[in-house]
Amino acid sequence: MNTFGNIFKLTSFGESHGTAIGGVIDGCPAGIVLDMEFVQGELDKRRPGQSELTTSRNESDKVEFLSGIYEGKTIGTPIGFIVWNNNQHSSDYDSLKNVFRPSHADYTYFQKYRHYDHRGGGRSSARETIARVVAGAIAKLILQKKGIKITAYVSQVGDICLSKSYIQVDFSNIEKTAVRCPDLEIAKQMIALIQSVRLRGDTVGGVITCICHGVPVGLGNPVFGKLSAALSNAMMSINATKGFDYGMGFNGIHRKGSEANDLYYRNKDGKIVTKSNYSGGIQGGISSGEDIYFRVAFKPVATLLQGQLTVDKDGNEIQLEVKGRHDPCVLPRAVPIVESMAAMTILDYYLYNY
């Protein structure tokens, strides 16, 4: 499947070392002012080569819109866009054409398709997420007009964890450090860890926390159309994700029911709200009007700049030595991707309701 969404739909295309990455957005309402500076700014957050913590692949990632825009506004027709690939070093992958790299998609793609583009991971590369960020930026622009804001940040790298709740951190600090952690002291520790593993030719994983603020009551459907399930599906479609939980999540197993229920009361404005939000803003698969917050776990990058044993397509055991340019940790560049997938999911359900 290369299409995401039911009403607000994105179909992405392209491979890591192909001519370009792009997409077609269907179902976008007409009359939306397309803030190009904002859209490009979102792309710049996931762009490679932005700091010493990311791959040195030097791509400008400038988006070109091909259709669906007139006089700076959407016109309700399919929005086509493209981002050209300009800095491929495909020769770095010549020796890997017949090799199954550990914990990559090489083996499964070979078994499923037999013929595929192995360069830079081809279609399985995180470069595909360019299309998601463009579509997510447009979704954000629409949601902002509805009072809905999506914010994500790095809350853990390896064993370095930001233990504070999202309500205790200053979101304005997120873009102040290369690792996109809002706690500046914890961020320094995260950066030091990433630099340390990079020097050893190794990699490290972590967790991104995301908050959807201002989501109205009623988004989502019972049983198989749950908003929580849709968010999980969206997040687990991102490269290198290995886990998703929302609200108190897995930590809830340590609580008793009397410690985990969100009690209702009427606030000073006469609105029914809850005293806590252990449920993460979703009850019965339907948004409750409270903040929706969740966490996404990312594995360490599978490409290591150190030798590993593997096999080739004929089953011969070989010592794998990898070249190329790779992230020691995907977390900093994955923040805008998580936000984009959340924005598209929330907007898709919003358009269904309204």
Swiss-Prot record:
What would be one Pfam family of this protein? Answer: Chorismate_synt
How is its cofactor bound, per UniProt?
A: Reduced FMN (FMNH(2)).
Give the Gene3D superfamilies listed for this entry: Chorismate synthase AroC
Q: Which InterPro entries has this protein been placed in?
A: Chorismate_synth, Chorismate_synth_AroC_sf, Chorismate_synthase_CS
Q: Quick check: keyword 4Fe-4S in the entry?
A: no
Single GO term (MF): FMN binding
Give the function comment from the record. This reaction introduces a second double bond into the aromatic ring system.
**What name does UniProt use for this protein?**
Chorismate synthase
Q: Recite the lineage of the species.
A: Bacteria, Pseudomonadati, Bacteroidota, Bacteroidia, Bacteroidales
